[in-house]
Amino acid sequence: MKYLLDLILLLPLLIVFSIESLVKLFIPKKKKSVAGEIVLITGAGHGIGRLTAYEFAKLNTKLVLWDINKNGIEETAAKCRKLGAQAHPFVVDCSQREEIYSAAKKVKEEVGDVSILVNNAGVVYTADLFATQDPQIEKTFEVNVLAHFWTTKAFLPVMMKNNHGHIVTVASAAGHTVVPFLLAYCSSKFAAVGFHRALTDELAALGRTGVRTSCLCPNFINTGFIKNPSTNLGPTLEPEEVVEHLMHGILTEKQMIFVPSSIALLTVLERIVPERFLQVLKHRINVKFDAVVGYKDK
């Protein structure tokens, strides 16, 4: 009975906070300044990471750029410098924990304390479970989620000391709703979303509310990693559109960034509608892409 009473007493807060959220939809939140911040972006040698670096370069930040591809990261750094920013490229394999820690030490010594960390590096293998090799599964988790632990452990302490900073997790809509033939990828992105949510709550529990968190969850992006993607949710997203949403989310300190926003509705439906209806809905959404299928029906 006591718990029921406590729940009833919380209802006014639910109403107030719901109205507050509704009002915020129509009143744009002021964007914060990131001038002078040291921004580290993993996977900055191409795609979302590269375009995100360009946007931060326009905002008077100092950039630390990580990627496994030396040519790609140097091209990104050169463009960032043309945009007026200091850019420090590092060749780093984000699947290797000790390499991450070693590079983090160099960053602190040569550049300074990172105050905005964008965990963007990622890999994807489009295949069913049987066609996905064991090393590919390991690599998927090493890059897509374990690297987030290592980079955050390296750079978060100073942010917590200053009660100032921002940790950005680049995840995926596949971190909320599953897609066949992306088993390893979906699993790793669910873990990345969980990392973001758990870290957010942990920072709050420790009283470090000045360290903000954001998580990007887009639909299919036209970056070439997944071949011939299509879905009835809409056209394949262009990287520029996704980065525009990402930057807006970071600068307004939005915790969960869905692109398109309809993804948020789908994640809610998955939790409340009957499973049979959900299967019909997924059939109508009709997600397609080129994939390798190793299972043979004998």
From Swiss-Prot:
Residues 1-21 form the signal peptide. GO terms for biological process: androgen catabolic process; steroid biosynthetic process. Its EC number is 1.1.1.62. Keywords: Endoplasmic reticulum, Lipid biosynthesis, Lipid droplet, Lipid metabolism, NADP, Oxidoreductase, Signal, Steroid biosynthesis. The keyword Endoplasmic reticulum applies. Belongs to the short-chain dehydrogenases/reductases (SDR) family. 17-beta-HSD 3 subfamily. This is Estradiol 17-beta-dehydrogenase 11. The lineage of its organism: Eukaryota, Metazoa, Chordata, Craniata, Vertebrata. The gene is Hsd17b11.
